[in-house]
Amino acid sequence: MAKIIGISGGSGSGKTTVVSKISEFIPEFVLISQDNYYKSVGDYEYEFSKVNFDHPDAFDNNLFYEHLKNLKKNSPIDMPLYDFINHKRQLKTVLVVPTPVIIVEGIMIFVEERVRNLIDLKIYIDTPNDIRFIRRLRRDISKRGRTLESVIDQYLNTTRWGYYRFIEPTKEYADLIIPEGGHNDKALYVLSTFLKSLSKEGGLDFI
């Protein structure tokens, strides 16, 4: 069975940076982003401004779980792709063929027990709120076609609440908590050394 490494934390915490660091020490892996499992806004009966993207129900949790379960059993999946500009799932999918290591990242991946039980190594990225907000603001404006006001309104109305209600409490499930996100060189060194030693020993059977 494939080994799954889960990386969670609030939006803008530095999950992508940590994934990049891990990739230097794992020769072969596939990356699954929970963001691709958002439900289309068209699936809701109300407009985008009232959709709470920082709630577990915003995700297609059943599909996400089934896909991770299949990958863990070394079965391929057709992963959805999410369009953040139009807030809809794209018609095309991506064929994902499992590798010995699966890296999964997302803000809510530790919320559901059934998903947690599939993850062999859980990493939580703990980054100060102001840093996360600035990163999210820059990303959403430059890459997702958002306005300054819409990002601020979303943060005040749903994002901040969702973080304290659903995301931060999942730290208790983490095997490793990395403060300061992807810029904590000491923590990343410890993590990379651990993963490198495992790969030299012939795999990640330890986790």
Swiss-Prot record:
It catalyses: uridine + ATP = UMP + ADP + H(+); cytidine + ATP = CMP + ADP + H(+). The keyword Ligase does not apply. ATP binds at residues 9-16. Signal peptide: none annotated. Keywords: ATP-binding, Cytoplasm, Kinase, Nucleotide-binding, Transferase. It is an enzyme of class 2 (transferase). InterPro entries: P-loop_NTPase, PRK/URK, Uridine_kinase, Uridine_kinase-like. It comes from the Bacteria. GO terms for cellular component: cytoplasm. Belongs to the uridine kinase family. This is Uridine kinase. It comes from Borreliella afzelii (strain PKo) (Borrelia afzelii). The lineage of its organism: Bacteria, Pseudomonadati, Spirochaetota, Spirochaetia, Spirochaetales.
